[in-house]
């Protein structure tokens, strides 16, 4: 094998191992599915996945002092409406991507 092929293989391995682990579960479904499931009240698995994602963020990442973490005073119904808006605007995205964006937005609303 030539040196350039070996170097290329090493480069590919280096870049692929730098990616984060894939997202599993309901958060990996499409926003299009979220919108359709919301219409018939079948969205609770996805919503609970998002709530778990935010809870995990609070447990392992959040360093602030707000007693409810990034949730603040936001309840699950409000999070569902926020995801409705996100997923309607981004149907090819995922609830996971929406949850990440929501965490950023919620954290920005907390007192500094």
Language-model-derived ranges and their functions:
Residues 5-14:
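Sec-dependent N-terminal signal peptides
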Residues 1-3:
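N-terminal secretory signal peptides that target proteins for export/translocation
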Residues 22-85, 89:
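Short N-proximal segments of mature Sec-exported proteins
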Residues 76-112:
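Surface-exposed, polar helix/loop patches in the mature regions of secreted/periplasmic/lumenal proteins
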Residues 15-20:
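N-terminal signal peptide c-region/cleavage motif recognized by signal peptidases
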């Amino acid at each position: 094998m030539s040196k350039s092929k070996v170097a290329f293989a090493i480069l590919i391995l280096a870049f692929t191992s730098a990616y984060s682990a894939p997202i599993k579960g309901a958060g990996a479904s499409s926003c299009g599915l979220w919108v359709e499931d919301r219409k018939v009240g079948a969205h609770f698995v996805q919503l609970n996945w998002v709530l778990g994602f935010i809870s995990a963020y609070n447990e392992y990442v959040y360093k602030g002092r707000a007693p409810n973490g990034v949730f603040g005073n936001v309840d699950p119904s409000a999070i569902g409406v926020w995801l409705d808006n996100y997923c309607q605007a981004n149907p090819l995205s995922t609830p996971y991507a929406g949850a990440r964006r929501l965490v950023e937005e919620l954290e920005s609303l907390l007192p500094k």
